C-alpha cells in the first residue's frame, strides 16, 4: 500500500515483484558507480592542468571505453531478460480470471466457474465508510486464493486501459480485440490496490482495482456464496 511522501516501492507481495526490486537495486548501484566515475573525471578535468590538447589518438582509452560499457550492458541485460522470461511463463495455473476494461469500470469473470462474474465500480467519496480509501475502494473486490498460480486474461471493450497492481509487480495493457495474459501469485493474504494506468478518458482516475488475497478455504466459501 502506498503512503504519503513515499520514496521507494510498495512492499513486494509476489516472487516477481521481489525479483523486480532486486533488479532495481542492482541497476541503481551500477548507475551510481558510473555517475560517480563521470563526476570524478569531470572534477579532475576542471581542477588539474595536466591536459593533452594535442593528443589525436589513444587506442588504449578507446578500447577501454568500448569494452567496459559493453560489459556493463551485459550485466544489466542478463538479469533483465531472466525476469522477462519469468513474467511471461505460465505453467498449469490453478485459476483463470478474465478481466475486461470499460469506460470506466472493470468486469471480472472466473472462467473455471459457471456464472461467476461481476462488475467492479469505484465507490464514490460521498458513500465511503470510516477507514476506507478515497478513489481506491470498489463495490466488488476480486477475491483470489493466495499461494496459488493465477492466470489473468486481460482485454478491453472500448478503449485502451492498463490493469496495474504495483505490489504484485503487475501492469498489463487491456487492448480492444486482443487478449493479453499475465500471472500472479501472492505470498501473503491482504488487500492490494491498483488503478488503470493508461489514460482512457475523463474518468480515467476513477478505475481502481482491489484484490483480496485469502487462504484457499475462504476463497472456496466465497465462490460458493457467489454461485
Swiss-Prot record:
- Which residue windows are coiled coil? none
> Is Transport among this UniProt entry's keywords?
yes
Alphabetical list of Pfam families matching this protein = COX2 (PF00116), COX2_TM (PF02790)
Q: Which GO terms describe its cellular component?
A: mitochondrial inner membrane; respiratory chain complex IV
Q: In terms of one coarse class, where is the protein primarily found?
A: mitochondrion
GO MF terms on file? copper ion binding; cytochrome-c oxidase activity
Q: Which residues lie on this side of the membrane: Mitochondrial intermembrane?
A: 1-14, 88-227
Q: Which SUPFAM superfamilies match?
A: Cupredoxins (SSF49503), Cytochrome c oxidase subunit II-like, transmembrane region (SSF81464)
Q: What Enzyme Commission number(s) appear in the record?
A: 7.1.1.9
PROSITE patterns per record:
COX2, COX2_CUA, COX2_TM
- Catalytic reaction list: 4 Fe(II)-[cytochrome c] + O2 + 8 H(+)(in) = 4 Fe(III)-[cytochrome c] + 2 H2O + 4 H(+)(out)
Q: Which residues bind Cu cation A1?
A: 161, 196, 200, 207
List residues in topological domain: Mitochondrial matrix.
46-59
Q: How does it sit in the membrane?
A: Multi-pass membrane protein
Query: Which family does the UniProt entry place this protein in?
Result: Belongs to the cytochrome c oxidase subunit 2 family.
What the protein does comes down to: Component of the cytochrome c oxidase, the last enzyme in the mitochondrial electron transport chain which drives oxidative phosphorylation. The respiratory chain contains 3 multisubunit complexes succinate dehydrogenase (complex II, CII), ubiquinol-cytochrome c oxidoreductase (cytochrome b-c1 complex, complex III, CIII) and cytochrome c oxidase (complex IV, CIV), that cooperate to transfer electrons derived from NADH and succinate to molecular oxygen, creating an electrochemical gradient over the inner membrane that drives transmembrane transport and the ATP synthase.
Q: What's the name of the protein?
A: Cytochrome c oxidase subunit 2
Q: Which organism is it from?
A: Boselaphus tragocamelus (Nilgai)
State the organism's lineage.
Answer: Eukaryota, Metazoa, Chordata, Craniata, Vertebrata
Amino acid at each position: 500500500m502506498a503512503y504519503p511522501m513515499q520514496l521507494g516501492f510498495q512492499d513486494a507481495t509476489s516472487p516477481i515483484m521481489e525479483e523486480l526490486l532486486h533488479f532495481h537495486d542492482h541497476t541503481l548501484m551500477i548507475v551510481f558507480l558510473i555517475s560517480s566515475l563521470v563526476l570524478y573525471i569531470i572534477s579532475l578535468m576542471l581542477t588539474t592542468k595536466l591536459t593533452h590538447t594535442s593528443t589525436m589518438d589513444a587506442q588504449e582509452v578507446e578500447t577501454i571505453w568500448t569494452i567496459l560499457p559493453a560489459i556493463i550492458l551485459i550485466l544489466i541485460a542478463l538479469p533483465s531478460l531472466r525476469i522477462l522470461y519469468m513474467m511471461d511463463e505460465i505453467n498449469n495455473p490453478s485459476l483463470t480470471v478474465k478481466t475486461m476494461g470499460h469506460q470506466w469500470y472493470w468486469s471480472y469473470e472466473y472462467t473455471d466457474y459457471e456464472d461467476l462474474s461481476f462488475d467492479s465500480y469505484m465507490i464514490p467519496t460521498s458513500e465511503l465508510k470510516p477507514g476506507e480509501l478515497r478513489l481506491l475502494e470498489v463495490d466488488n473486490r476480486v477475491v483470489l486464493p493466495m499461494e496459488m498460480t493465477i492466470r489473468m486474461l486481460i482485454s478491453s471493450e472500448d478503449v485502451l486501459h492498463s490493469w496495474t497492481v504495483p505490489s504484485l509487480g503487475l501492469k498489463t495493457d487491456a487492448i480492444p480485440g486482443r487478449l493479453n495474459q499475465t500471472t500472479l501469485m501472492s505470498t501473503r493474504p491482504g488487500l492490494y490496490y491498483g488503478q488503470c494506468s493508461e489514460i482512457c478518458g475523463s474518468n480515467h482516475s476513477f478505475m481502481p482495482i482491489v484484490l483480496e488475497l485469502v487462504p484457499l478455504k475462504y476463497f472456496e466459501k466465497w465462490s460458493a456464496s457467489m454461485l
